[in-house]
Amino acid sequence: MYRELIGELIKNNDWAQLQEPCPERDIDKAEKYVGYTFPDELKALLRETDGDRWFLLSVKEIIENVERNRNIMAEYFEPDEFLEKVDRHIFFATNGCGDYYCYRILPNGETDTAAIYLWEHELFETHAVAENMTDLIVKYYGGEI
């Protein structure tokens, strides 16, 4: 489903390239490293393409992003503030300008799947930009976000 959708949307894009499907063991590894269970739609996307080298991150890039955030950004915040503003998110796509598309993690540890959010790195704030993964992909490659 996602592979066909993205393939159609990027056919005139010289930079985006669908990748091979992500092995299940790598998705499991990423979930463990991030510390949160990925929503079903994110897992489904990764099972079809492990990123697109443009907008969608691979599981390796997801892990590297979390590692970078924990090693660099954590020192600038109190622990609770870091958890709330940075670490309580699942970042899986980028706009190329330092901001990330993500799911928020609620204080009870559950993933907020009511929307997909844009995390703004200058303000450490999020706002909803899409209803679901399909909506996000269509909006991004359609130039709406």
Spell out what each predicted region is.
Residues 1-101, 144:
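A surface-exposed partner-binding patch
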Residues 54-56, 60, 108-110, 119, ...:
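Generic alpha-helical propensity signal that fires on short helical segments
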Residues 125-135, 139-142:
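Compact, glycine/acidic-enriched structural inserts
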